[in-house]
């Protein structure tokens, strides 16, 4: 099957936590025999052995949007930020996306499905319906951020489902069983669960000296502050063990742990294999919504790491 994919980004240098999972998913599609054509919503097009990429028609608009988000990245400005971004995107970026998608469908001729992965739906509201007026083709949305992206939880950077029309899509795919009911209440015609997994070829263990007692890597501290305190802040303050922490926007007291800059992927694997115990400290929301999967336990297990995890409401 030939599939056209619109995804959040292909750029591993962008601070989007799901991008490694996205790469593995696309590689898996290729290995199952599918031909992929990928349009990134953010960042440059990147060709690989596993897919062809079409240039992002809104690259410079994305750069400008990054600057706007940094400018408005303050709680006092949060309401304004939520309200105007989807409007600007629908006016400026959606027409270019529609044009390049239609051009690609015409040129390739035999694309059998369109999949949108982790893109902000309220910024492209109406796009799927407009495409279907010309092409009778199934369009699926795969949201890697549910339940955080749901309007009831406010989203990550901004609330990108609020105001979207989920009925445009033939199916919505999410990694959270406990979120299905809300998706249907929001208008999804069909909702299915695909839990996270990992590519064992990517997460191969390496043999290195175990010189770190406890390791944690993750982005965002406030969303898991209680468990970080329990598993890192308090024990590192009283135990004579080496705690190492890395990530973005942690912003909380982490006791006597050693704080390192965010790892690249290859650095992270090396540190994981150096650690005697890897800490999986899940966000509160992912832990408390029933049967919501996160990729970290499977990544660590594939590398044969010893893992101590904060609890989940159904792993």
What are these regions (language model features)?
Residues 41-108:
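A conserved catalytic-core segment of Leloir-type glycosyltransferases
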Residues 132-134:
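Acidic (Asp/Glu)-rich catalytic clusters
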Residues 140-155:
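A short, histidine- and acid-enriched strand-loop-helix "catalytic/donor-clamping" loop
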Residues 69-73, 143, 244-246:
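Short, compositionally biased low-complexity segments
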Residues 2-50, 57, 108, 117-127, ...:
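Nucleotide-sugar donor-binding catalytic core of glycosyltransferases
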């Amino acid at each position: 099957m030939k599939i056209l994919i619109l995804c959040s980004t292909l750029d591993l240098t962008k601070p989007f936590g799901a991008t490694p999972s996205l790469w593995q998913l696309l590689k898996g599609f290729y290995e199952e025999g599918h031909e992929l054509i990928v349009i990134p919503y953010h960042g440059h097009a990147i060709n690989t052995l596993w897919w062809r990429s079409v240039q992002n028609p809104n690259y410079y608009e994305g750069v400008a949007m990054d600057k706007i988000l940094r400018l408005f990245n303050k709680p006092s400005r949060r309401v304004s930020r939520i309200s105007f971004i989807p409007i600007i995107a629908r006016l400026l970026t959606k027409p270019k996306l529609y044009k390049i998608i239609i051009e690609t469908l015409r040129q390739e001729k035999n694309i059998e499905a369109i999949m949108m992965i982790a893109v902000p739906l309220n910024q492209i509201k109406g796009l799927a319906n407009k495409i279907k007026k010309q092409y009778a083709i199934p369009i699926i949305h795969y949201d890697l951020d549910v339940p955080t992206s749901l309007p009831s939880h406010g989203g990550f950077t901004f609330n990108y489902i609020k105001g979207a029309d989920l009925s445009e899509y033939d199916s919505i795919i999410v990694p959270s069983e406990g979120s299905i009911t809300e998706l249907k209440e929001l208008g999804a015609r069909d909702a299915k669960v695909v839990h996270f997994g990992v590519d064992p070829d990517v997460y191969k263990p390496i043999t290195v000296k175990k010189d770190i007692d406890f390791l944690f890597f993750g982005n965002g501290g406030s969303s898991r502050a209680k468990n970080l305190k329990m598993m890192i802040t308090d024990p590192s303050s009283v135990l004579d063990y080496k705690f190492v922490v890395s990530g973005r926007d942690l912003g909380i007291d982490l006791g006597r742990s050693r704080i390192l800059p965010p790892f690249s992927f290859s650095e992270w694997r090396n540190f994981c294999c150096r650690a005697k115990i890897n800490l999986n400290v899940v966000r509160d929301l992912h832990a408390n919504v029933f049967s919501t999967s996160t990729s970290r336990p499977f990544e660590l297990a594939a590398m044969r790491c010893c893992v101590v995890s904060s609890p989940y409401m159904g792993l």
